[in-house]
Amino acid sequence: VRDLVAFLSSLGRLPEFTIKPDQIIARRWQTLAATPQAAHAITRTSIKTAAQEHPDFVWQTAYSSVSGSLPLSEVPHMHSRYGLKPGDLGASYVRTYLEVLQPGRAKLQIEPSKGVSVWIGETPYDPATSPEIDWTAGPQKITLAIDRDAAGSGPLSLRVVAPAEKGALIKAVGGK
């Protein structure tokens, strides 16, 4: 109880317990349940299948912490690729949604960057080689395939950074 009171009294006062309104951070995620059917669908095709709608996929809602990070240790992982050794974690699949209110340029900052494949809709996106995107207005689905053996079990975060000029106006979709 004492820890809960200390935590609640820190909300909004300490930087790690403060939500900054000028930052666009994904806070609501959907994680792909680690079912045998989902693992089979991805293994049979490729990891890009996670960016598509598939009848064997069951997505569950997860929320990031106040700091904007989603602990990967709490995200389901599955053996959905060949060549895994005993003890390998395999991969996790998550998605989030952004609403582009005004078209323009912006980039995604994703941590960890190692071992993460990204799709905007069903189009592959490599933050390292093409950091800025020309966004069109409307809802955008961002899907991540995370190689857990490369990325580890630390926190996952996705931030949107728009330049001051010709930048897109984007908000992260929240709610339940």
Describe the predicted segments one by one.
Residues 86-99:
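Short beta-strands within extracellular/lumenal beta-sheet-rich domains
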Residues 77-82, 117-133:
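Solvent-exposed beta-strand/loop surfaces of large extracellular or lumenal domains
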Residues 99-100, 104-118, 142:
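Aromatic-lined ligand-binding clefts that engage carbohydrates, nucleic acids, or primary amines
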Residues 106-110, 133-148:
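Short, well-structured beta-strand segments within conserved domains
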Residues 112-114, 122-124, 146-148:
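A mature extracytoplasmic/lumenal domain signature
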